[in-house]
């Protein structure tokens, strides 16, 4: 994001291309001839680094293009035809994937949320309601649980919350899936107490987001235990999601997991977001949600919205009953200090 632009952009965290180090390595290796379909040395190097970061020596790792694709493939691979996936009513698979999960033949079973989070007690209650219903054989069976870290509202699951949810899932013998589209920003947040190793221990599958965290594209799907889904490679292919030139994704993750680049990108975003949050509070802008990560949800009246929108691109979130609007500001790995300075001056 260049400070010379007339209009600042804080609309989302995937507006830029990729971290310059990724582009440098892609250019350096451009004319190399490597094996396809993730069988190249760069993809294998990335897998080794991710296994080390997750403290999961037996993990199977696959590189897919984007988050919706990863969610659709993983969920379809883990569920039987008569099963659905439990998720928050605000979850990405519930509202922002154009029915991709339903298109694959599986119902999203939604639960009420608090800043995008659901609880172990809610999940346990939903599972019990199914078990105790005399007509359950005529109903969609809850077959897995979907969470995201951070949530759509920028909130974080604590380690205790994830441990409780994982325990419920394991007692019910259903998989827990964690969407990590913005995982770099969760890991870098001072309020976070969940590590990659914790996620690998508690979830049956998760993905490490690249698209929103410094890569041109790509998500790394991680199964901590080998053979969780037999022949997952073939399932990816069947969904049209297998990259022939998968080395391009593998190389990006190899770069992100070299010299802590993934963590540094998250830290850049959180530092910028914390500065903006502090300025908003100092200038008495109400915040709609207590979100400690890279997404900030501010409440604007019509005059404030019109004034700021002339110079700052923000994301619309929701209209409130009092006529005000919740707008989202998102920082990223690429946010520049001077752009934060300019935004604060405009408030």
Stretch-by-stretch model annotation:
Residues 19-67, 89-94, 100:
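Conserved N-terminal alpha-helix of the aminotransferase class I/II PLP-enzyme fold
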Residues 77-95, 124:
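Conserved PLP-anchoring active-site segment centered on the Schiff-base-forming lysine
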Residues 81-82, 274-347:
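Conserved C-terminal alpha-helix-loop-beta "cap" of PLP-dependent enzymes
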Residues 105-143, 147-150, 157-164:
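PLP-dependent aminotransferase-class I/II
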Residues 108-109, 176-178, 287, 314:
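Hydrophobic beta-strand scaffold residues
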Residues 114-115, 141-142, 148, 156, ...:
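Active-site C-terminal subdomain of aminotransferase-like
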Residues 157-189:
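Catalytic PLP-binding core of fold-type I/II PLP enzymes
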């Amino acid at each position: 994001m260049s400070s010379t632009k007339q209009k600042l952009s804080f609309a989302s965290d995937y507006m830029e291309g990729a971290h310059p180090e990724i582009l440098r390595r892609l250019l350096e290796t451009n004319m190399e001839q490597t094996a396809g379909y993730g069988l190249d040395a760069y993809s294998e190097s990335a897998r080794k680094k991710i296994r080390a970061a997750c403290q999961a020596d037996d993990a199977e790792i696959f590189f897919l293009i984007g988050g919706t694709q990863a969610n659709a493939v993983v969920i379809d691979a883990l569920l039987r035809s008569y099963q659905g996936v439990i998720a928050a009513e605000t979850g990405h698979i519930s509202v922002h994937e154009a029915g991709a999960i339903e298109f694959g033949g599986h119902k999203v079973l939604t639960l009420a949320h608090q800043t995008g989070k659901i609880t172990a007690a809610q999940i346990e209650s939903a599972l019990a309601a199914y078990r105790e219903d005399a007509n359950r054989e005529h109903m969609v069976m809850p077959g897995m649980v979907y969470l995201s870290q951070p949530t759509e509202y920028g909130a974080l699951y604590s380690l205790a919350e994830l441990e409780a949810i994982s325990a419920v899932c394991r007692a019910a013998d259903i998989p827990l899936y964690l969407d990590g589209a913005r995982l770099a920003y969760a890991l870098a947040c001072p309020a976070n107490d969940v590590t990659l190793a914790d996620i690998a221990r508690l979830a049956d599958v998760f993905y490490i987001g690249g698209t929103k965290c410094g890569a041109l594209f790509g998500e790394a799907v991680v199964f901590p235990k080998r053979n969780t889904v037999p022949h997952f490679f073939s399932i990816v292919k069947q969904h049209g999601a297998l990259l022939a030139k998968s080395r391009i994704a593998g190389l990006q993750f190899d770069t992100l997991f070299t010299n802590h680049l993934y963590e540094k990108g998250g830290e850049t975003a959180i530092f910028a977001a914390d500065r903006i949050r502090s300025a908003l509070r100092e200038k008495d802008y109400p915040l709609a949600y207590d979100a400690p990560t890279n997404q900030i949800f501010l409440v604007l009246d019509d005059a404030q919205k019109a004034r700021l929108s002339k110079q700052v691109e923000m994301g619309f979130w929701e209209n409130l009953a009092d006529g005000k609007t919740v707008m989202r500001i998102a920082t990223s790995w690429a946010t520049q200090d001077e752009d934060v300075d300019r935004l604060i001056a405009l408030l």
